[in-house]
Amino acid sequence: MEEQIIISLGSNLGDRLNALYKALALLEAYPISIKLLSKVYETPAWGFKGEPFYNACVSIKTKLKPKDLLEVLLKVEKTMGRLPSKGKGYSSRTIDLDLLFYKSKNIFSAKLKVPHPKLHKRNFVLAPLCEIAPKFIHPILFQTIEELFQNSSDRIIATPLTYDLGLPPIFKSFPYIVIEGNIGVGKTTLAKLLAVNYNSKLLSESFTKNPFLEAFY
């Protein structure tokens, strides 16, 4: 079984979906690459009264050590305007990023506990987690994520939504997107892929009007 590094994302303030997109983009500004993305799930606030959350889980690849990865998560939260919690208990937040698993490591320190000590009690984590890592074995409880979800005592229902976190809503801001570059580097392939994924019209250049094609081919 491939070991995974898994992060959970949650937001219940402002534009919740955009917050998830933005958090992923900010994470990839660091030496982090996204491997797997779950669907977006909507769930009621857990442990306090507040607006519903959008939640998701992501499997990543990184050479960052656990403590350094935690620092990145905290930096992203701060960049997105998350304020430090006042007092004990849970509260609404623009973005919430938690390190659920770092491969099969068991980490217990004042600042970081991995696996996340409460993930097996929370359906808003287990539902998206089960989607991307159903057979991953919890290194302390020795059950798969699938088994933990099936045996969960949490009665909260996590409702899957149709949003695709792998496809940011770029056409909301740009009615047209132009792809430029050297001949033969894959512009047309990329443009066709975007057109298919976003169900958009592809406007290809005219080969007869491109003076550089003859010299290239």
Tell where the protein language model's regions lie, with residue ranges.
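Extreme N-terminal starter segment of soluble prokaryotic enzymes
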Residues: 2-7, 174-176
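Hydrophobic positions on the alpha1 helix immediately C-terminal to the Walker A/P-loop
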Residues: 190, 194
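Conserved lysine of the Walker
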Residues: 187
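Flexible, gly/pro- and Lys/Arg-enriched active-site loops
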Residues: 47-53, 67-70, 75-172
